[in-house]
Structures are given as C-alpha cells and as structure tokens.
Curated annotation (Swiss-Prot):
Residues annotated as binding Zn(2+): C80, C97, C104
Function: Catalyzes the hydrolysis of the adenine ring of phosphoribosyl-AMP.
Catalytic reaction(s) noted: 1-(5-phospho-beta-D-ribosyl)-5'-AMP + H2O = 1-(5-phospho-beta-D-ribosyl)-5-[(5-phospho-beta-D-ribosylamino)methylideneamino]imidazole-4-carboxamide
Name under which the protein is recorded: Phosphoribosyl-AMP cyclohydrolase
Assembly mode: Homodimer.
Predominant location: cytoplasm
Gene: hisI
Subcellular location field: Cytoplasm
Family affiliation: Belongs to the PRA-CH family.
Amino acid sequence: MTDSTFLDEITWTSDGLVPAIARDAKTGTVLMMAWMNRESLSLTAQENIAVYWSRSRGKLWRKGETSGFTQHVKSIRLDCDADVIVLDVEQMGGIACHTGRESCFYRELQNGKWVATDPVLKDPKEIY
C-alpha cells in the first residue's frame, strides 16, 4: 500500500480538488484534464490506473469504466506550486476523449475560430 502522506503536500482547491492533466507517456500529447480528490489520487497511486473525481456526477470516475479506454499510469508529477498534477499514461485503445478522439484538445484557434483539427477515431455511439 502507498504511504498517503504525499497527499498532504498538495495545495487542494477549497472544494478539495486538484486539476490533473493526462498526457501520453510516449509522445507527450496532452490527452485530457480532469479533477482529482484525495481518494482518487490515492487510488491512482495504488493501482496505477487513472481514477478521477467527476464533479458533475459527484463520485469517483474510473477512466474507461464504460468505454474500456483506461489509462495505465506510468508516472505522477506535481508542479512547482503543488497545485496541478500531471499523469503520464498509456492510453488504452488510443482514445481519451468522449468524442472518440485521441485527445480532448482537438480544437485549434485559427483566424479567430475554433476548428476541429484531430480526426474522430471511433464514433462515440459505438463506444457508449
């Protein structure tokens, strides 16, 4: 079992959360941003599988529990201000976004408009 004292070094929001950025461990591509609470970060550190806190559902969210696209955690990093987590992950199935794309950051600002630049790898209707 992991020693949980590392959790005390994090600067949590007033809601008891910390933003967590998941990126591909091999390519460095930013896949998504989600929130973690103490329990989800502790579980992630213990199991090496990404577990987040769903603010909309008010419960733990095991990434990939519905889609099968889990994130196997290779490393957990804390920024210099101790208020942002970065997870280096192996994204199972190559899809992190509920839109069926590799990354949730698939839109790019071009000439003042947001343009979808990354392809849909799988129709979300086939995933969920």
